[in-house]
């Protein structure tokens, strides 16, 4: 296929996407706190991940900037973490995560997408079976696709099927990994993490990978997610989170044991071969993490307001399977 043929094929596919209502485009919006301005219309923003309002909190932003040492306002790491990009603030954030979660170690990544796309290919080989919920995020699916592991996607939250698969295949693989989200971004339902922990313990050499992207900051007494809420943090082998949603920053992280952390540093391609986040971004994440612990009122407000909206929608005849702030 030459260039012209490829261009024509792309054009035809774009036309088909438009005809089916699936053509994506970048909206020319202006943000104004909780409002969005688009095509001369002012609309309430109900589509962002700024769950606690931190991104639009001008006072919080000013407090951070007022107390920031100008020598730490470094806007580029200029390197990967394995070369010269591993600034001291990385260790500061990872120590705080380790202390908060009471786990052996933590590792910060350039994005949540890099995190999910890189961990599974690093730890899973051809002797590994991945059992993933049907509705896990695209970044997890992409990570599974480029891994050498075999994968079976069990029906969404069908834990009877999951147990059947564990029972059927555990003798045929060196290890198995159960992969799930704690709060599913598509429909807002919550995984029963204690049940998954129970299943993990029942079958030898089975590990549990939980993406808490939509739960960190907003669930649990200290905002550490559903795992904190259900008191099962120690039982989760790879507890993943993001700074890009409730924390109003950028990047991803995993808390795990030290051996797994060291292994990821050596084998995780999306960690090794990418430029580290700017140090000033990590300074902001560190600041927000410390603030987040005490944002219990904000978490309660989010839960109450989500329930009010859900009830209002139900009165209008809409239904929702959500048991979280995602409606």
Label every PLM stretch briefly.
Residues 152, 156-210:
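Active-site phosphate-binding strand-loop segment of PLP-dependent enzymes
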Residues 191, 286-327:
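Conserved PLP-dependent catalytic core of the aminotransferase class-I/II
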């Amino acid at each position: 296929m030459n260039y012209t043929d490829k261009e024509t094929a792309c054009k035809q596919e774009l036309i088909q996407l438009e005809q089916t209502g699936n053509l994506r485009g970048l909206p020319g919006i202006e943000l104004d706190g909780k409002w969005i301005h688009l095509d001369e219309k002012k609309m309430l923003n109900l589509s962002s991940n700024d769950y606690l309002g931190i991104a639009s909190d001008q006072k919080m932003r000013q407090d951070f900037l007022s107390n920031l040492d100008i020598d730490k306002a470094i806007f580029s790491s200029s390197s990967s973490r394995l070369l010269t990009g591993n600034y001291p603030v990385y260790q500061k954030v990872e120590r705080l995560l380790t202390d908060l979660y009471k786990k052996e170690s933590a590792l910060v990544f350039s994005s949540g997408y890099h995190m999910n796309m890189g961990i599974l290919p690093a730890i899973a080989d051809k002797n590994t079976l991945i059992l993933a919920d049907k509705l896990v995020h695209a970044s997890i699916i992409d990570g599974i696709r480029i891994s050498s592991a075999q994968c079976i996607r069990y029906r969404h939250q069908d834990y009877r099927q999951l147990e059947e698969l564990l029972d059927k295949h555990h003798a045929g693989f060196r290890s198995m990994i159960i992969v799930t989200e704690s709060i599913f971004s598509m429909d807002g339902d919550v995984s029963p993490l204690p049940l998954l922990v129970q299943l993990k313990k029942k079958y030898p050499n089975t590990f549990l990978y939980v993406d808490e992207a939509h739960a960190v900051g907003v669930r649990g007494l200290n905002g550490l997610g559903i795992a904190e809420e259900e008191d099962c943090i120690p039982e989760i082998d790879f507890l993943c989170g993001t700074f890009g949603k409730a924390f109003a920053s950028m990047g991803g992280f995993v808390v795990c044991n030290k051996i797994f952390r060291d292994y990821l540093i050596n084998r995780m391609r999306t960690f090794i071969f990418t430029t580290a986040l700017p140090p000033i971004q990590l300074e902001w994440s560190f600041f927000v993490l410390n603030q987040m612990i005490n944002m219990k009122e904000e978490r309660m407000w989010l839960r109450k307001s989500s329930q009010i909206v859900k009830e209002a929608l139900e009165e209008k005849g809409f239904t929702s399977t959500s048991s979280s702030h995602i409606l």
